[in-house]
Amino acid sequence: MLTLDKIYHAAFVLKDVVRETTLIPSPKISANNNIYLKTENLQVTGSFKVRGAGYMISQLSEEEKARGVVACSAGNHAQGVALAAQKYGIKATICLPDGAPISKVEATKSYGAEVVMVKGVYDDAYKRALELRDEKGLTFVHPFDDDDVIAGQATIALEILNNMKNIDAVVVPVGGGGLISGIAYAIKHLAPHIKVYGVQALGAPSMYNSLKGGSIETLASVSTIADGIAVKRPGDNTFKMCSQYVDEVITVTEGEISSAILALIEQHKMIAEGAGAVAVAAAMFDKIPMKNKNIVCVVSGGNIDVTILSRVIERGLLTSGRTCNLCIELMDKPGQLQAVSAIFASLGANIISVHHERASEAMDINGCYLRIVLETRNYEHIDMITTALKDAGFRLV
């Protein structure tokens, strides 16, 4: 059973295992609220997950420690369990979905754990971990639906409350619900006036749908760059706790997540993974139902694969109006490309790439398409460019 005493005990046990992460202001994230970032992406292993895993493993009996532990994860919980097991001299077996980022797989191995790759998503890895538990007598370290794990995650709330006064809301990423359950439980018992909002990716809204429907819903599939919260089904305990203590769960799109990752890089020189950036995305795109309030966004992790990061940055630039794709119909005669380029130059747009296309059934026999990618300042700048092109007689396709 989760209690405040258990959470305070977790904070005591974890003081030599985890670091107390900083709480920093982020004045440019939102024009409507005062945003502060709880930087769990700078935690040991790059994620908050080591808190819950560390506390749960610390509470095992000597017999359980001797047999070893097994866990499943989209990546971050794996590293937390692996590091905690290493600290206590315990053998750890970790089941990972085969789509887990390479960076997380290699990091898990680096802490000495045995990694078992499982075809599918988190829920498939979960099933395999339970099979190994039964076959080998291992202790299963649940990534979210366990009171000790939730107590470990709740220590984040204690740090937030100790480091900042006059908080109006805390915004938390939601996958299976362990992180937000712990934070919401602690906050509603210690400072019940503070609102707690959860954020899920639109492509993996299991807790959002479950709370809206009033019962646990299992999704047929999930698809999101926020792999750390790509969970088909919330936990039984976490669903009950979220129903009781969380004020609202909201969703953000893939483009909004990408924009948030980009904003953190540019404004704070900080790397966040997709799951870690969803709370910031909610603040950036005014999804939080508050104005002129002090809001803490939990940046839950920073373990993003560099190949994914490059694609996310490209998408973030596109979503925020920093790049744009145009298709312009031209007459196939000399000087047309020069005329278009002159418009771009006069408005300060930089050409990234150009593709000249003559063969298309849709165009006039004497025409051609110019497909072009531009570096722009914002959406207003894009509007200026498209207006200038139309005024010059060019047709946008």
Give the positions of each predicted feature.
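PLP-dependent amino-acid enzyme catalytic core
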Residues: 1-397
